[in-house]
Structure formats: structure tokens, C-alpha cells
Amino acid sequence: MVDGVMILPVLVMIAFPFPSMEDEKPKVNPKLYMCVCEGLSCGDEAHCEGQQCFSSLSINDGFHVYQKGCFQVYEQGKMTCKTPPSPGQAVECCQGDWCNRNITAQLPTKGKSFPGTQNFHLEVGLIILSVVFAVCLLACLLGVALRKFKRRNQERLNPRDVEYGTIEGLITTNVGDSTLADLLDHSCTSGSGSGLPFLVQRTVARQITLLECVGKGRYGEVWRGSWQGENVAVKIFSSRDEKSWFRETELYNTVMLRHENILGFIASDMTSRHSSTQLWLITHYHEMGSLYDYLQLTTLDTVSCLRIVLSIASGLAHLHIEIFGTQGKPAIAHRDLKSKNILVKKNGQCCIADLGLAVMHSQSTNQLDVGNNPRVGTKRYMAPEVLDETIQVDCFDSYKRVDIWAFGLVLWEVARRMVSNGIVEDYKPPFYDVVPNDPSFEDMRKVVCVDQQRPNIPNRWFSDPTLTSLAKLMKECWYQNPSARLTALRIKKTLTKIDNSLDKLKTDC
């Protein structure tokens, strides 16, 4: 019987031989080729650089959509290039400078067979014959061998593997079924690690079912959607806010932004529904909604208050700092930080969303990438230098200081909802008592620049050590002189110190 068990893997290896090492062996110092780039994913660029070039043709709502581009890493295009053409999509790949210039992918026609299709059918036939051969040889041994294998496997299985077989927020499935967790994990270990390959993004986007609208605004709508049983958020931009969609898509696909306090990006796509073009941005779904909505319904204790503000500061510090190396990122300023652009997660932390106005800066090139978006930030959260138009628009630090001003206002919103001595204030937006619900630019300029007013600090805060520390911190975010304001990293360290002192106080008690 032991012999039978030993024979089983040998015969399976005969039936399903491993790919040759020649095919799988990674290339040392792979050569990069210049490729023609045409289509939505190219932006304003007419070329790109990668290890493989491609030309594709797909059918979208009855229209032929042609695209050309490159796979930065050979493995990215490996499966795509080997896939035989289908009636709805065909991809041709090549290696060499500008090799895809004169290549046009063609969809298969009746009676016409492609070499890739013939090889595919041949491989399938060989596999079927191998399987039949293996089954005939193993018919007598299979039952007992499988029974023994199952028994041994169950003895080794840790009960926790069954109980905790999910990743937070993303459902795991059987081997062979792609999940968001699989796709996102792969995106962090191949290519730039910044996002899914464009062809994968389009596949995910077209398999999503919209379930319910969870928010509306001037930018468009946010829907809860479903992809293979998993909840996702779908932000559908209005046509007038196309630049914001393009900016977020560009930023997420070129920058390593994976951080627990930055909203997780999944895919972006331009699709057609009800005879109109829709711009989709697909992200992780957080059912608790925005911080703005959360604070109106929920009061906070000291621990939950600090968890919220520290997580926001951590996300902002990650945006502001430049990280060097292959898994690095440029420094980024948000430019529209507010409680409506911050989402609350199940664990009580927050993540920063809406990067449609973001500005990027790289020290190595000293280039400031402001983007091409006519949209401006939210007037209620604008810093004095923005309102009086004295901001140095060619200096990246100026944009970071604008974020710090806005963070101070968000900190004030959160602190008002923290209960101390049984007292708590109702939720109110910043400057609620001196400007109307939808303040104009002039309204805010008079209050912030001319009168130099700041949000009111309630007296009860000074009887609570945590609120006293938070009040001091927010005041240091509101200096009229931008260069005097704290940095995001300093704010994060200060909040961590406040949090640690609270833990120490609990331990001493």
C-alpha cells in the first residue's frame, strides 16, 4: 500500500509534466524596449518602456477598441500573451524597440485557426490522454491512497486555519478562484507594486454588480458594489469632474500607496452604461462611511478619539514623506483634506480618500507635479494663504502646510465629540458659527484672513488632560504663518506620545 502511495505522485508528474526550466528561468538584467502606447492607460504619453510590447483589440458595447502599450515586467504579460484570441478580445505581444508599431491584433473568424489555438487544443488533448492513462493505472490504489492522504492531512491541519480562513475585509476562496486579496497581493510583488495591470483592472470593473447608492455629491455618486461576493466601493465621477478621475487613476497606478490609513485602490475603468460614458474608481468598501457622517451619530471616549486622530495623522505623514528605493514613492500633498474625505474602518481607525487634487514632488528630479485639474479645494477648510492668494504655488512645502491647516480643523471636529466628565458638544463643521452653510470665498477670507478667527475651544476641554493636549496641538496647526505650523510627522509623534501616556496612566491605576 505504501508503494501505491509513492507511485501516485510519480504518475501525476508523468501525466502533468512541469514546464521546462528554460521557459520559467528568470532573465538576468532583462532588456527594456521602447513601445508605442495608444489608449486610455497612456494618458498624454505616446510611448512607454517595458520588457514586452503588446497590441490588443477588444469589443466594447459593439465598438472595436484598439490599444497598444507595454508590460513593465515580463511576468505581467505572460498569461495575457499566451491566451488564444477569442471572439471578444485578441492580444499580440512582441519584444523589440517599437515592435508593436505595425502590429494590429485581429479577432478570429470562422474557418480561420490561429497557431496559438492549435497548440492549445493539442495540449488539451495530450492532457486528457495522460489523465485517462493515469486513472487506469491507479484505479485499484486511488481509494485507499486518498483515504490515507486525507487522514494525514487532517492530523496536520491547525484548527485555527479553519476558524480564521479570511483576510480582514476580503473573503478567501478555493485555490484557482482569484480574489481581491490575491490580486492586490500580486500587484504589490510584481511591476511597480502600485496597482493592478490595466487589463486586470478592466476585467474586475466589468464583473462588478452595483447594489446601492451610498453617497452623492458634486463629483458624482458612490455605490456599494459586489465582485465575486465581496463588497467594493464604486465612485462614479460626473463628466465635468473627469480630471479628478484621471488624476486619481494616474496617481494610484504610478505610485506605491499601500498603507492602512490610505483608502485601498482596486481598479479604474471608463465604461458605457445607459448610452452615457461613466468614469469608475473602484476601492475597498468601508460600511461605516465618512468621518463626517460618523461623528454626527457617534460620541467618542478617549481611546477611540485618539485612535481616529492618530490614524489620520499616520495616513497624512505617509502621503507627505518621500520614500526612496524600488518600493518607494514621491512626496504627496492631498489639498482637499476634510472629514468628508476620511473614511472610518471597522477597527476604529480611519483612512484618507479622494486624491483627485493631489500634488506630487520628487527630490531627485525636483519636479512639482500639480496635475491639470481646475477644481479647487473645499472653501471651509482653506488655509489663510490660499484664501488671500499669497501661497507659493511653485513650492511643494506650501501644499503640505495647507494640509496641516485642514488637519487641525478635522482634529477640532473629532475632539468636540469626545466625552469628558459626562459632557460632549454636538457635531458642527468648522466655523459653523461665523459663516453660512455653503460659505463663499469672500466669507472665508474675511473670517480667516481679515478677522483671523479660529474655531472656538470649549472651556470644558481644559479640565481633561487629553483634550487640553489636543487643543494645544490644533492651535499649532492654525498659525497664520504657514512655515510655523507643525509637520505631519511631528503631529504623529505627538499624538503617539499622548496615546502612550494614556496607556501608562491606565497601567498605574
From Swiss-Prot:
GO terms under biological process: BMP signaling pathway; cell differentiation; cellular response to growth factor stimulus; determination of left/right symmetry; dorsal/ventral pattern formation; germ cell development; heart development; in utero embryonic development
Pfam families, sorted: Activin_recp, Pkinase, TGF_beta_GS
Residues that carry a glycan: N102
SUPFAM superfamilies: Protein kinase-like (PK-like), Snake toxin-like
Active site: D336 (proton acceptor)
Catalytic reaction equation(s): L-threonyl-[receptor-protein] + ATP = O-phospho-L-threonyl-[receptor-protein] + ADP + H(+); L-seryl-[receptor-protein] + ATP = O-phospho-L-seryl-[receptor-protein] + ADP + H(+)
Domain GS, first and last residues per copy: 178-207
Cytoplasmic side, ranges: 147-509
InterPro entries linked: Activin_recp, GS_dom, Kinase-like_dom_sf, Prot_kinase_dom, Protein_kinase_ATP_BS, Ser/Thr_kinase_AS, Snake_toxin-like_sf, TGFB_receptor
Spans traversing the lipid bilayer: 124-146
Modified residues annotated as Phosphoserine in this record: S501
Keyword Phosphoprotein belongs to the record: yes
Ranges in the topological domain labelled Extracellular: 21-123
Membrane topology: Single-pass type I membrane protein
Protein localization: Membrane
Domain Protein kinase: 208-502
Enzyme Commission number, as recorded: 2.7.11.30
Molecular function GO terms recorded: activin receptor activity, type I; ATP binding; metal ion binding; SMAD binding; transforming growth factor beta binding; transforming growth factor beta receptor activity, type I
CDD domains linked: STKc_ACVR1_ALK1 (cd14142), TFP_LU_ECD_ALK2 (cd23535)
Cofactor: Mg(2+); Mn(2+)
Subunit architecture: Interacts with FKBP1A. Interacts with FCHO1. Interacts with CLU. Interacts with type II receptors AMHR2 and ACVR2A. Interacts with BMP7. Interacts with BMP9. Interacts with BMP6 (when glycosylated); the interaction may induce HAMP expression. Interacts with TSC22D1/TSC-22.
Function statement: Bone morphogenetic protein (BMP) type I receptor that is involved in a wide variety of biological processes, including bone, heart, cartilage, nervous, and reproductive system development and regulation. As a type I receptor, forms heterotetrameric receptor complexes with the type II receptors AMHR2, ACVR2A ors ACVR2B. Upon binding of ligands such as BMP7 or BMP9 to the heteromeric complexes, type II receptors transphosphorylate ACVR1 intracellular domain. In turn, ACVR1 kinase domain is activated and subsequently phosphorylates SMAD1/5/8 proteins that transduce the signal.
Assigned protein family: Belongs to the protein kinase superfamily. TKL Ser/Thr protein kinase family. TGFB receptor subfamily.
Protein name, entry field: Activin receptor type-1
Gene that produces this protein: ACVR1
